[in-house]
Design a protein with these regions (language model features):
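Helix C-cap/helix->beta junction micro-motif
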Residues: 126, 186-187, 217, 339, ...
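Conserved core of the PLP fold type I
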Residues: 55-182, 198-200, 207-212
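N-terminal small-domain helix-loop-helix segment of the aminotransferase-like
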Residues: 2-90, 97, 379-380
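Conserved core segment of the aminotransferase class I/II
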Residues: 44-48, 215, 219-290
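Conserved glycine-rich beta-strand-loop-beta hairpin in the small C-terminal domain of fold type I
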Residues: 269, 273, 289-297, 309-322, ...
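PLP-dependent enzyme catalytic core of the Aspartate aminotransferase-like
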Residues: 326-328, 334-344, 348-380
Length: 380
């Protein structure tokens, strides 16, 4: 029996939630935010912090970094105690800072595509060039072409790895990560591994932290991680930057300070520590999301067979092929909006043949959303 209730949810309409900046009759399955109540330990920790009644400047506490150490040991049997760590406001502020610190204007920065749209933004906003490495799509699955990776690394200064991958949900194998690390060392490429979605895998044995894959990874890699995605605390800005490369971390610390993104807020450490100690909640939310994915797959097969759901065992994001509809994603999401459903166009991630749907919602909400998706398809 479940300890936690994922069928109930707060009413976010009319408030300042980014995902719910929609009309009251619209269902948003777009922005990567959960609709669930947070783990009880998180709420308790925040209330305890709030009750202090004085909210001055704070610094990242040592027990925060200890909590990360314990989390990695419990989840992956990976010891990061000797890794050097830094606090940051978030994965994207960290990424922007690292781009500035480890590359120069108009350098090439490579990443797998389709890609999280903010990767494109951070690269372009810092006056760098994007080198796209397309993932291979076949039979509703993705795979890597490591020859393309090597060609990209010959020209790249930085490689941004999203592991597991957003938006496709692809989980990189240990062997693939080893090859990436060794190619990066061969060509002098820094690997920035964004692992924010890593808690969102039902079978944690499928995930290999990049720096645990091989000794070369520890030499060439910096990891960006945060509990914000896995435990639904994105509004409380907190993240971790860590590496075993001391020279890299010297530049990281300088850059985070230069860009003013290394300051902790009053609630961030408490929320993060409580989240990292809520593995029971994480296990149950992954089970719930997995069941939602199975429901989505069955619904599409039964009622919207023109759509194809990409096979995935990670994240709470569904990547759906709409190429049989004879329309592109930008036009299709407009039709969905007319039917009261808000979803994300694949064009912003680099592939207009797909849409992305958020599954981290109560099943009742997902069911209503899928009914509207069906209506949108039937209206074409």
């Amino acid at each position: 029996m479940s300890k936690f209730d994922f069928d109930s949810y707060p009413n976010k309409y009319g408030l300042d939630y980014a995902k719910y900046d929609v009309k009251p009759n619209e269902i948003p399955l777009s922005i990567a935010d959960m609709d669930f109540y947070v783990a009880p330990k998180i709420k308790e920790a925040l209330l305890k912090r709030l009750e202090l009644g004085s909210y001055g400047y704070v610094y990242p506490r040592e027990d925060l970094f200890n909590a990360y150490n314990e989390y990695y040991l419990k989840m992956y049997n990976f010891d990061i105690k000797e890794a050097r760590k830094a606090f940051s406001l978030g994965v994207l502020p960290s990424l922007s800072s690292l781009i500035k610190s480890f590359s120069n204007k108009w350098d090439f920065i490579s990443t797998f595509t389709p890609a999280y749209n903010c990767f494109f933004n951070e690269i372009r906003n810092n006056d760098r060039n994007i080198f796209k490495i397309p993932l291979i799509y076949k039979d509703n699955k993705y795979s890597l072409d490591l020859d393309l990776v090597e060609e990209a690394f010959k020209k790249s200064k930085i490689f941004i790895l999203c592991s597991p991958h957003n938006p496709t949900g692809y989980i990189f194998s240990k062997d693939e990560l080893i090859t990436i690390a060794r190619l990066a060392k061969k060509y002098g490429v820094l690997v920035i591994s964004d692992e924010i979605h890593s808690p969102l895998i039902k079978d944690k044995s499928l995930f290999t932290p990049f720096l645990s894959s091989c000794k070369e990874a520890k030499e060439v890699g910096i990891v960006l991680f945060s509990p914000t995605k896995g435990w639904n605390i994105a509004g409380i800005q907190t993240s971790l930057v860590y590496s075993f490369n001391e020279a890299y971390m010297d530049k990281v610390d300088f850059g985070l300070n230069r860009d003013d993104v290394g300051e902790s807020n009053f609630f961030s450490s408490s929320a993060a520590i409580a989240a990292l100690n809520s593995l029971d909640w994480l296990e149950e939310v992954n089970e719930y999301i997995s069941n939602n994915r199975l429901f989505l797959s069955s619904y599409i097969h039964s009622y919207i067979s023109l759509l194809k759901l990409v096979d995935s065992s990670s994240t709470y994001l569904a990547w759906i092929n709409i190429s049989s509809l004879k329309t592109d994603a930008d036009d299709f999401i407009k039709v969905c909006k007319e039917h009261g459903l808000i979803i994300s166009s694949g064009s912003i991630y680099g592939d207009s043949s797909f849409v992305r749907i958020n599954l981290a919602v109560p099943k009742s909400v997902l069911t209503k959303g899928l009914d509207r998706l069906k209506e949108a398809v039937e209206s074409l």
